[in-house]
Amino acid sequence: MLAKRIKWFHVLIAVVCVVGLIGFFHNHSLKKETVMNKVRTDSQYGNVEIATLVNDGKTFNYAVNYPVFKNEKMDSALKRFAEKEVRQFQKETKDVDQEHTTKRNELNVDYKIVHYAKQTVAIVFNEYKYIGGAHGQTVKKTFNYDFSKQAFLSIDDIFKEDADYLHKLSLIAYHELKKNKDIAADDALLKEGTAPKKENFSRFAIKEDYIELYFDTYQVAAGYLGEQSIAIKKSLLKDILKEQYIDKAKNKNKIKEQKPKHEVISLPKEETVDPNQKVIALTFDDGPNPATTNQILDSLKKYKGHATFFVLGSRVQYYPETLIRMLKEGNEVGNHSWSHPLLTRLSVKEALKQINDTQDIIEKISGYRPTLVRPPYGGINDELRSQMKMDVALWDVDPEDWKDRNKKTIVDRVMNQAGDGRTILIHDIYRTSADAADEIIKKLTDQGYQLVTVSQLEEVKKQREAK
């Protein structure tokens, strides 16, 4: 009996030893790859601390720096951001084969406080990540925090509610970056990267005198050109920027800010319309159709004219590039319903859905929300007008190109009825109409007409009436 007890005692001791050894080696392993959170003081801003997440592991290493402002809401969010970057990196490296490479996977995140004032602080994170392959990847991530709102800001938040800020930023960015010949070499990429979409302008910093925009590698130019940035003078945006982000006292930096590398101090020259010269508005319905619509856009560009395209939501969803090109080249986009029904035969609810769904898809693709609507067949009533809250744009000249598919017939009908201040209706989905439009655009230009959008035409009429 005693021998059995001794035997079980020895077994128990052995088990404890094994468990202890396992625990020792397990703890030793954790210690070796422990994530350390170091804290030190920022050299520029004494009230800001720098926290660092570090791991110097066998197969990967990372160092993630982030600022601590002693502002609970902001600090919590920045800490979550840093930890999320680490978790994402660990997830991405989990299954990477390290047997055939001597280079460890790496994540390095550093930051710079580019602006710190009473109103806001702007933090730009620079992230380098290497996970196998020939090269690592570098990206920028920005945070703008409003102390009065106690909230982080998106690009939407800094502009006035009804401001068409995306188109203004798009216009400025495109023309500024195009001044660099190397960037201008790939015009299609530049246009895509500066198109009026929120995601193209999501990396920004509110500074003392500027709104600085950042563009990642490959966004607007070939990879070898790297990241790009432009800093737009706030004075150029004063008509659309919210007052609290312009106020000198509130936006005065705690230290002297560095002068930006690429400063924008003047707006690109926009073509103006002379109200004393003949004007005519070409309008195109039922598109887009890439083949024929782009043909018309080519002619407008060649003769430095503009037009208004009343598009169908059902077609826009399939041809977003054509829609973006329309806007990028200074043309106007209007709403022509989703699927071209006679709106007055629908219930008000159904008719509004046709319009609103089209508004939404246009805005989703381009960032632009039309102000003009052209009801199919011109069918409209007072109730719909009041409910839509959009300007209704009809026409003066209809060559019935949808019925008579003959280029000469279409050209003759338009030219015979063309006149100063008139609006022409053509459909951009037919080849014969596109061919006719080429000739019409040339002839009208030769006759001294300025080819304008519907909105420009209305503005000219107002200017003339005011005289």
Curated annotation (Swiss-Prot):
Active site location: D285, H427
Subcellular locations according to the entry: Cell membrane
Annotated site residues (Raises pKa of active site His) in this chain: D401
Phenotype of null mutants: Cells lacking this gene show sensitivity to lysosyme, in contrast to wild-type.
Protein topology in the membrane: Single-pass membrane protein
One GO CC term, this protein: plasma membrane
InterPro entries xrefs: DUF3298 (IPR021729), Glyco_hydro/deAcase_b/a-brl (IPR011330), NODB_dom (IPR002509), PdaC (IPR025303), PdaC/RsiV-like_sf (IPR037126), Peptidoglycan_deacetylase (IPR017219), Polysacc_deacetylase_ArnD (IPR050248)
Main localization category: membrane
Keywords assigned: Cell membrane, Hydrolase, Membrane, Metal-binding, Transmembrane, Transmembrane helix
Source organism per UniProt: Bacillus subtilis (strain 168)
Transmembrane segments: 6-26
Keyword 4Fe-4S: no
Function: Catalyzes the deacetylation of N-acetylmuramic acid (MurNAc) residues in peptidoglycan, a modification that confers resistance to lysosyme. Is not able to deacetylate N-acetylglucosamine (GlcNAc) residues in peptidoglycan, but can deacylate chitin oligomers such as GlcNAc4 and GlcNAc5. Is essentially not active toward chitosan (partially deacetylated GlcNAc polymer) and has very low activity toward chitin (GlcNAc polymer). Does not deacetylate GlcNAc.
Family according to the record: In the N-terminal section; belongs to the RsiV family.
EC number: 3.5.1.-
Keyword Membrane belongs to the record: yes
Activity regulation note: Activated by divalent metal cations; Mn(2+) is the most efficient, followed by Ca(2+) and Mg(2+). In contrast to PgdA from S.pneumoniae, these ions are not absolutely required for deacetylase activity.
UniProt cross-references to Pfam families, sorted A to Z: DUF3298, PdaC, Polysacc_deac_1
Inducing factors: Negatively regulated by the two-component system YycFG.
Protein's recorded name: Peptidoglycan-N-acetylmuramic acid deacetylase PdaC
Molecular functions (GO terms): hydrolase activity, acting on carbon-nitrogen (but not peptide) bonds; metal ion binding
Ranges where the NodB homology domain occurs: 278-452
Superkingdom: Bacteria
Binding site for a divalent metal cation: D286, H336, H340
Other information: The product of deacetylated GlcNAc4 by PdaC is GlcNAc-GlcNAc-GlcN-GlcNAc.
Any one GO BP annotation for this protein: carbohydrate metabolic process
